[in-house]
Curated annotation (Swiss-Prot):
Belongs to the conotoxin D superfamily. Residues 25-45 form a propeptide. Its main location: secreted. One of its GO terms (cellular component) is extracellular region. Hetero-, homo- or pseudo-homodimer (identical sequence, different post-translational modifications). This is Alpha-conotoxin-like Cp20.5. It comes from Conus capitaneus. GO terms for molecular function: acetylcholine receptor inhibitor activity; ion channel regulator activity; toxin activity. Keywords: Acetylcholine receptor inhibiting toxin, Disulfide bond, Gamma-carboxyglutamic acid, Hydroxylation, Ion channel impairing toxin, Neurotoxin, Postsynaptic neurotoxin, Secreted, Signal, Toxin. Alpha-conotoxins act on postsynaptic membranes, they bind to the nicotinic acetylcholine receptors (nAChR) and thus inhibit them. Through its two C-terminal domains, this homodimeric protein would bind to two nAChR allosteric sites, located outside the nAChR C-loop of the principal binding face and at the adjacent binding interface in a clockwise direction. This toxin specifically blocks mammalian neuronal nAChR of the alpha-7/CHRNA7, alpha-3-beta-2/CHRNA3-CHRNB2 and alpha-4-beta-2/CHRNA4-CHRNB2 subtypes. The lineage of its organism: Eukaryota, Metazoa, Spiralia, Lophotrochozoa, Mollusca.
Length: 95
């Protein structure tokens, strides 16, 4: 089998959810539903974890341990999410 065909086959087999261009961490929930996403949304362990489920009924989502802003993950929990005209959402952090 040519190298290109092998590479394409591997890329088709790997789930695209492993790759997150938005900067957040893609995580997999348990097989019984979105248990991990629900756990992270409970804001346990003194963090402000937020999860965005990609599609309803899916166990895949982007979870951020600070603050979600659109599809981005802000660097700190004190940051606020703002919308810039023509540039989209962005994080505004004090100091």
């Amino acid at each position: 089998m040519p190298k290109l065909a092998v590479v394409l086959l591997v890329l088709l087999i790997l789930p695209l959810s492993y790759f997150d261009a938005a900067g957040g961490q893609a995580v997999q929930g348990d097989r019984r539903g979105n248990g991990l996403a629900r756990y992270l949304q409970r804001n346990g362990r003194d963090n402000e974890a937020e999860c965005q489920i990609d599609t309803p009924g899916s166990s895949w989502g982007k979870c951020c341990m600070t603050r979600m802003c659109g599809t981005m993950c802000c660097s700190r929990s004190v940051c606020t999410c703002v919308y810039h005209w023509r540039r989209g959402h962005g994080c505004s952090c004090p100091g």
